[in-house]
């Protein structure tokens, strides 16, 4: 097995000689695969050492003739040619005499996107075969850098130079080009979370966007709820339409809270409760207008408003996000440092005998500075506990509500404890009293680091809680302030690598935010989020091992572990977590589950009914291929004459659908 296949050996094993279209594979000729395994595996393609591969990368040259390659291409192979070689020339990609310096690129998918290399390269201007389509070119002279064409059932893709050490430093959209040329993707996930801010989507067709989110693998939307805390009639109607559109697509909708920012109206109405910075200005920092929630009157009024907000709309959950203190500059910038309201100053002075405001006057006693920073972190934990109690009281009226806490990571970048007052070791023990997802937010300080940080972050949380299934990771897809290349914002292969690695390190991946994900990335996003640890192929039988469940391209009836499997939409067979065998066969069920936002543990078509076992931290929207006539939950008849979409309770349940 070549060296790169050995490196991937821990992730998967392919066996058998027959490879179906549902399991696209790749092979890189030679012993130096470069970054191609990182690129191709980021959307689920599987490496194979021998036998027919769907994608073959030739980096330098090939002992096989161009004629033999053309024959394989006609039969369905996608051949990738890297740089200058005799083989590339035989396919019409020929270097010319003119040479140019390349540093800025233009891609057909995002012509206005700035794609810049960290170091310019001098290279020839290539002549292309007449049938080739240019995907990426040098921005100013238009010299082709990535091009390809379809031939028979297959295709040829040519890149002018290697894609870089990590696979995304030069050409962010190589996978998109391969997809355009007919490369199939093997797996899909439907478990992503995404954050949503209506101020960026005021005039959109919410039904259209809900379908698009579902197709991109989004299972839940975290909606900026502060806009609706004291919203007008138009805002209220918008939110109702948004929630309804998402529910029709079996997408959950969470109220995303950003306390201590309550709302614009709350800030204007209560200047007496505004948080203060360490220079005693009102704490209006970036877009957030912070409120002193330590003040009992302010807390009572804000909690009353939050209760009304949650009870007035058909939310599926609540996300208590970023409930700690500014700023990422910590005490080095008093103008952004919080909290410094009168209540906090008085409380800390009672505890430590010093007004914390004096700690910003040099020289400050180091032990008092340390005491205040630790007090600040414990205060954040205290407020989280208070607000969880509020949400639990609301959940007694709405027992289907799911809960989440989003908190910036302080384990990988340990400075965060002192900068923001966030401490996972204080917050995670709350899981002993409350059921919630703990969503770890990527700190801005490490946005420039690669995807390998996610397994490292996950490892740092293992000692903190035995409830590893409650951990999730939030990837910030935004423009980064660091010097990064080739794009300021993660897109293409870089984004897919981040999502792919994160999905293997954590049970749940969230993206901030849906508006920032560039349109070219949406069709492949669900594939990047699909985690598969092992796949075996033996004739018509495919064995798949997935930690979280996965969808595979499929049409027609299927047997899962030898039994008729009823969880399938028009193009995807949805396989539960664990190790399972799949093969065509059996009678097509008269009724199928097409969408299901819970965790399917087992499902059987009996010939008359679907017998289903599932679990979910939120209520479940289950869309069927035809209307159900009867529903039983845990042996109790619930209803008859149901439609094609039914709502099931949170928790663990056994369901019969007829």
Q: Would you name each region that the model predicts?
A:
Residues 24, 38, 42, 77, ...:
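A glycine-centered loop/beta-turn motif at secondary-structure junctions
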Residues 327-328, 384-455, 484-488, 498-501:
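Substrate-binding cleft/loops of secretory-pathway carbohydrate-active enzymes
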Residues 35, 81, 162, 174-177, ...:
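Non-catalytic C-terminal accessory domains or segments of carbohydrate-active enzymes
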Residues 431-531, 536:
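Substrate-binding cleft of secreted/luminal carbohydrate-active enzymes
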Residues 84-147, 151:
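An acidic, glycine-rich "communication" segment
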Residues 23-93, 211:
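Helical hinge/lid and interdomain linker segments adjacent to catalytic or ligand-binding clefts
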Residues 43-48, 203-229, 312-313, 429-439, ...:
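Catalytic domains of carbohydrate-active enzymes, especially glycoside hydrolases
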Residues 200, 252-313, 356-373:
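Active-site-adjacent "subsite" loops/lids of carbohydrate-active enzymes
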